[in-house]
Amino acid sequence: MAQFQQTVNMQTLQAAAGRNSLVNDLASRRVYDNAVEELNARSRRPKVHFSKSVSTEQTLLASNAYPEFEISFTHTQQAVHSLAGGLRTLELEYLMMQVPFGSLTYDIGGNFAAHLFKGRDYVHCCMPNLDVRDIARHEGHKEAIFSYLSRLDRQRRPVPEYQRAAFHNYAENPHFVHCDRPFQQCELSTVNRWDTYAIALHSIYDIPADEFGAALLRKNVKICYAAFHFHENMLLDCDSVTLEDIGATFQRAGDKLNFFFHNESTLNYTHSFSNIIKYVCKTFFPASQRYVYHKEFLVTRVNTWYCKFTRVDTFTLFRGVYKTSVDSEEFYKAMDDAWEYKKTLAMLNSERTIFKDSAAINFWFPKVRDMVIIPLFDASITTGRMSRREVLVNKDFVYTVLNHIKTYQAKALTYANVLSFVESIRSRVIINGVTARSEWDTDKAILGPLAMTFFLVTKLSHVQDEIVLKKFQKFDATAKELIWSSLCDALKGVIPSVKETLARGGFVKLAEESLEIKIPELYCTFTDRLVLEYKRTEEFQSCDLSKPLEESEKYYNALSELSVLENLGSFDLDAFKELCQKKNVDPDVAAKVVVAIMNSELTLPFKKPTEEEVAEALSGEVVQDEGLRLSNKAPFPCVSNLKEGLVPACGLCPNGANFDRVDMDISEFHLKSVDAVKKGAMMSAVYTGKIKVQQMKNYVDYLSASLSATVSNLCKVLRDVHGVDPESQEKSGVWDVRRGRWLLKPNAKCHAWGVAEDANHKLVIVLLNWDEGKPVCDETWFRLAVSSDSLVYSDMGKLKTLTSCCRDGEPPEPTAKLVLVDGVPGCGKTKEILEKVNFSEDLVLVPGKEASKMIIRRANQAGITRADKDNVRTVDSFLMHPPKRVFKRLFIDEGLMLHTGCVNFLMLLSHCDVAYVYVDTQQIPFICRVANFPYPAHFAKLVVDEKEDRRVTLRCPADVTYFLNQKYDGSVLCTSSVERSVSAEVVRGKGALNPITLPLEGKILTFTQADKFELLDKGYKDVNTVHEVQGETYEKTAIVRLTATPLEIISRASPHVLVALTRHTTRCKYYTVVLDPMVNVISELGKLSNFLLEMYKVESGTQXQLQIDTVFKGTNLFVPTPKSGDWRDMQFYYDTLLPGNSTILNEFDAVTMNLRDISLNVKDCRIDFSKSVQVPKERPVFMKPKLRTAAEMPRTAGLLENLVAMIKRNMNAPDLTGTIDIEDTASLVVEKFWDAYVVKEFSGTDGMAMTRESFSRWLSKQESSTVGQLADFNFVDLPAVDEYKHMIKSQPKQKLDLSIQDEYPALQTIVYHSKKINAIFGPMFSELTRMLLETIDTSKFLFYTRKTPTQIEEFFSDLDSSQAMEILELDISKYDKSQNEFHCAVEYKIWEKLGIDDWLAEVWRQGHRKTTLKDYTAGIKTCLWYQRKSGDVTTFIGNTIIIAACLSSMIPMDKVIKAAFCGDDSLIYIPKGLDLPDIQAGANLTWNFEAKLFRKKYGYFCGRYVIHHDRGAIVYYDPLKLISKLGCKHIRDEVHLEELRRSLCDVTSNLNNCAYFSQLDEAVAEVHKTAVGGAFVYCSIIKYLSDKRLFKDLFFV
């Protein structure tokens, strides 16, 4: 082939050289055709427009550097660093040429405008604002786009076709086009985990090299192409390196590397030198345990280096690759370091392989070929100091000079001669009149210092040779003097102070009696320097083991101290060590404290023994509290002036104040400062002494905390109330003393005490008397606050009594013998007390007044008065007014309902010899009603001397006795002749309960206060909760449950169920609206045989059932869902899960409600009945669905509809809260919230910055009608912030239960501000929300706001199904209207931590305290206190914050695996077996929530099932909810129908994967007990949603 081509060429040349014109023409034609083909090929190159004005040389430089492009130079724009700026375009296009067209590409730090102009709709730019210059650059990009679009608009031209997709993305989905986060934190997700690509144009400088690989892998980047500026001289000890081609300079100062352009006033760029060196020197960038990114250099063009990073799967490496051989030469070199560092460092240094190939170095660094690094020395005559620097010099030049001057004689070897020779071989020479250029192009500026280096090296080499020759000669002078003499003679006149100069330069080393001459290394190659530079950045630091050994010794001694514990194997030693290290606590002291705590010799007041609680108690010393001396000199008409005396300032502490044992009066609290009461509450103390004494101290602190919380709330009421509201009926009240009227009217009168504000605005506690319903006040008082908690002196009196019997803050330990009588319900505990008690010398104490009256009545029923108010008393009365007598025996009924410290005080104050405490260990125990007060578990156990059991019930029938045997140890017997007494009835909704149609027989009991109040509103009488009637007996009882959602207190293990089933003697019937565990219990009791019931009159053992749990193991597969089935499959599935719902004929329910008489329980409101008659309107025609569901027709707003909705959503709010200190408790909750969810690095905030951009962002999301409402708003003054508008939604919300069969569902309401208010506070809270979401630890917690549904699946995708875990769902009914003053306080404190403006925050707070609702459509006006407004700007994020704060206050969030929150929905994954508090009680008493806690196998969040499996999780939309939507009755036309289909397709995309349908069936079965396997239904759903025609068949006109 080669011979043939050569022949053709020769023939062509011969033809061209001949005279034949035809042949010549053919040759010319051939040359012309070749030129045309070449030019056509060049014209097909990508075209790049180079508008910068550059010189001719720079034009040629750019054209030669990038032959892949056809560059057109127009020279129409003058700019700074024109060449570098123009090359950026070429560099970007060159990088994009490497990426496959259409593949998703991340442009790290890129220019999104350039991609839009090119029509690239597949590029996402990560543009973080790392400094102000970045912000300005990004604004310039936006301005360029705006100018381009404006020009098209002026010319009335559309956007070109190739740009439309990109500009459409920019307009509709700007987050896909660009984001303001660093690449490592970019939130853009890829579809189906396809491979992506990335480019980095001059942006990897600011990405840490150690994070680069992991960041690429997170985005599933296959190849990343990068370009950056670099120069070989940067690896030398050079302070400055110039990039001549682009006119820029690198300047190095330590690790700081500055980059700037010459002769320009532009900002400098600063980078990390060590980080850039890693990118240059490292080859592998680890991304995970499996993947690494391998770096390869591509090409170098105009001072820009190109490289690519390729993802490599190390699992595919041949196993022989992993053998690591040791370089013996490098190992011996590293042995010197092994003496200073660890031996492993020597092994690491010996195994380094990077850049060992010099050919590769020379290829990629061509300028360093045959170059060596020479040190240069500069000396100062004035200071005597010497500096050192390095340069690259040709290797041949160095040896030529050294070999020549080595031949000089000693006299001829001078610096001048060496410099002369160096200059001569560097300069031009003239040979025969012709100038010849020197062979070596060495910089003339360094010839002088370079000659000095050659001179010094040669001189020292001669001196070394002389010493070797004279080594065995004898001289009078010492060797040291001889050497110094030789050195001084050799260098005389060259450098002053030769000795100091040589020593400073490292040429000689001095010792006291020795001298060492060391010739420095003449040079090192660039390869060696590159390896050294890389090693320098990777060397390990030394480690001092002395301190760790000392700490280990301390921990060993501490472990010896802990060895006395019984369960040492379960003791967490790692947590103990972390505690001591984090809190700087001595391990030995901490071990002794732990042993004392475990042995109950010492108690710390915490709920959980966390390291923070233990460290807080160990670090600080308890300060002795001083007594508060009172002197009342102010006139007081009803309470006599007080004498001076001492009263306690707070609860007990180990070193408390001294109190004399005197009979103090409660009036000593009069005019006591509120600060004296508040300062001692919730203090951190260490309880010491015996366990009884510790319990007594805890009880006194409990009373102090309760009093402090009440006083604090009264102070808050005084601060908050400003205007007059005489119509309100609240728990708290404020009396204006000077005007003689209520500013805030309480719902009760005749309070015992309150908090008054005097003329000096000082707050004091005052005791009250009343005159005709008005408090008698001092003339110096300004205002007075009272509340329902200040109706009696209970806490004051008890606190006074208990502190009076203490000496030096230590209560005496009671010496009485304590006998615990544990009896089953109905065992005759009260009867036994009456039989054993001697009323002349014994004392009987009971918890309540009713029980006291009952015992007195039964004791005196024979006609002889034995019991009276002196020997049968309530516990509170006894503690407030202890008698001055001694009792022989003490009988306490229902003792477990009391604080254990209270029981000990009762024994102490009664001076009894024996105390009988009658309890039921399985019934409701003492509930701590002060939020966040520490009541450790071991304090809840009474210290008893004897225990007696009563296992024969005189009250309970035989079937209930069977249930009791499952609860108590031992056999429970009964004496009742009644065998069957319990029954249950499931009613069709709460509306079926009515005193007329369904009268209830016997005593009516409920589980919740809400159900109790609702029954009272319906007209039922004599209704109490189960907790209120504990200890009572009734012949017949009726237990009612109106709450349809599950309640945690209704379970087999709940003491509430036990109490409820054991109050009757003959009959008990349970009415419920839903199947629950209590129905199952009653059903089981009804199935018992008569023979089995008779057995409980004799001893019988308890049988247990062996259960086997199933374990599911799945695989992460994608199996397409087959499109099969019929719409009747969906109908069958709906009817199976919700039987009866499809048969409801509710089309005319709204008409029936408007026509028939109706009775509504309405709170105070104003109604305009002129709005009751609706204006006739033409009713629209809607399409009818084939699927029959419980969906209703759209309703029309009117008086009745709106009023019913308002009653349901806003009135009759629950009131379950116990006694809490709102301010202190809110602060504690917020601190827990912050510690639980906020990343520690972002826990500090710089304050909120309201800018024009934040308002513009809010305004851009508003509709045009909203903007029009702001046209006449001047923003000078605020409208009324406490006024809201009220409206309803036309479509009722479908419930996935059976309530629709008996109830008329109320519509959802929207309570909203005017747009003018939203324009002020909307941007502010939007910015605060953004700040909060940025600080949340998103690896563990999901706040589902400002996110897409697919991000739910991404969040749960890293769940480990092999880990044993529990799934908790907290469902709260009446969530919005249950939120009261405490919830607002928590939310405001969170906004304060984020930096909200104080003035606006106060305006917002006052606007949400007491609010007015106006419904102009229905003519309704009412007033609400607090509550969550459904249309407020903070509704969604506020609800999300509250549910998250509620859970963080009760659940240890540091142990949580995953948690998600959205409005009132929550989903928490916790390790299995985690010890949790009573969430039901906490939610009721502290948060006023009717909470239901679900424990499930699969999670349910925002209408979606979260199915976790062995490789992650998949989220399925609730199929039953989807079918319910397919039966909707508000579709207007086919366009509306198509919109519905598309929206359903979006939310149900995961149903196309049928790999996990079996787990989905299990999840559905957890919620709906009648569920069947639904795979056939899911296939049918996909079939109809994916086909427009089939979907239209589901509806007809």
Swiss-Prot record:
EC number: 2.7.7.48, 3.6.4.13
Entries under InterPro entries matching the protein: (+)RNA_virus_helicase_core_dom, Alphavirus-like_MT_dom, DNA/RNA_pol_sf, P-loop_NTPase, RNA-dep_RNA_pol_alsuvir, RNA-dir_pol_PSvirus, ToMV_Hel_N, Virgaviridae_RdRp
Residue ranges of coiled coil: none
RdRp catalytic domain boundaries: 1365-1478
UniProt record, GO biological process: DNA-templated transcription; mRNA modification; RNA processing; symbiont-mediated suppression of host innate immune response; viral RNA genome replication
The UniProt record lists the keyword ATP-binding: yes
Enzymatic reactions: RNA(n) + a ribonucleoside 5'-triphosphate = RNA(n+1) + diphosphate; ATP + H2O = ADP + phosphate + H(+)
Keyword set, alphabetical order: ATP-binding, Helicase, Host-virus interaction, Hydrolase, Inhibition of host innate immune response by virus, Nucleotide-binding, Nucleotidyltransferase, RNA suppression of termination, RNA-directed RNA polymerase, Suppressor of RNA silencing, Transferase, Viral immunoevasion, Viral RNA replication
Amino-acid positions noted as binding ATP in the UniProt annotation, renumbered to this chain: G823, V824, P825, G826, C827, G828, K829, T830
Sequence ranges assigned to domain (+)RNA virus helicase C-terminal in this UniProt record: 951-1103
Single GO MF annotation: mRNA methyltransferase activity
Domain Alphavirus-like MT: 72-280
Every (+)RNA virus helicase ATP-binding domain range: 791-950
CDD domains (alphabetical): Virgaviridae_RdRp (cd23251)
Subunit: Heterodimer of a large and a small subunit.
Family as reported in the entry's similarity comment: Belongs to the tobamovirus RNA-directed RNA polymerase family.
Described purpose of this protein according to its UniProt entry: The replicase large subunit is an RNA-dependent RNA polymerase active in viral RNA replication. The replicase small subunit is a methyltransferase active in RNA capping and an RNA helicase. It also acts as a suppressor of RNA-mediated gene silencing, also known as post-transcriptional gene silencing (PTGS), a mechanism of plant viral defense that limits the accumulation of viral RNAs. May mediate silencing suppression through either inhibition of HEN1-mediated siRNA or siRNA demethylation.
Other facts: Readthrough of the terminator codon UAG occurs between codons for Gln-1103 and Gln-1105.
Protein name per Swiss-Prot or TrEMBL: Replicase large subunit
Source organism of the structure: Youcai mosaic virus (YoMV)
